[in-house]
């Protein structure tokens, strides 16, 4: 992965202009053998100030706001007592919720200043293995925490959980993990009606 020349500057200016607790920009997926599509700029694109609830809603619906840490600049105080889970995949998921919950407001810009290089051997692209269920467990905990702390976002949280379960489920293509496949399919059946048409 790599960043644009304006990566930190844009995040810092957005945070300062908004008086926010953290700022977030966007990333571009760059595939092997393909050129970068976006053009870096120091102009803040589509600058927005988001409330805590609106920010969480965007994260849950994956509307331009992701759980990934590299596209964000946080005030250090948000991380007091928060640690990334050791030895787990997709460790950004639980941390993103905890720090967003503590923020009063966030700044968002559409600048694509982080370039996420896609290799066939990356965690996201590698064949299914049971360690990928860390993602499902994190998203289930996220859903339960949102239901407790922000009940008005319960259905959005269910939608995010369902999306994650489907993502992992569709990666299973062998009989070796049939038991896991069936368990994930039960989760899809449990949440699909409640999650679809949530807006």
Q: Which sequence ranges carry the predicted segments?
A:
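Secondary-structure edge/capping motif, primarily at the C-terminal ends of alpha-helices
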Residues: 1, 120, 146-150, 169-176
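Membrane-interface aromatic/basic loop that binds lipid-linked glycans or pyrophosphate carriers
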Residues: 20, 174-199
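Glycine- and acidic-residue-rich phosphate-binding/metal-coordinating active-site segment common to enzymes
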Residues: 112-146
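Residues within HEAT/ARM-like alpha-solenoid scaffolds
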Residues: 134, 152-160, 179
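C-terminal, non-catalytic tails of nucleotide-sugar-dependent glycosyltransferases
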Residues: 137-156, 193-198
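Amphipathic alpha-helical repeat scaffolds of TPR domains
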Residues: 159-170
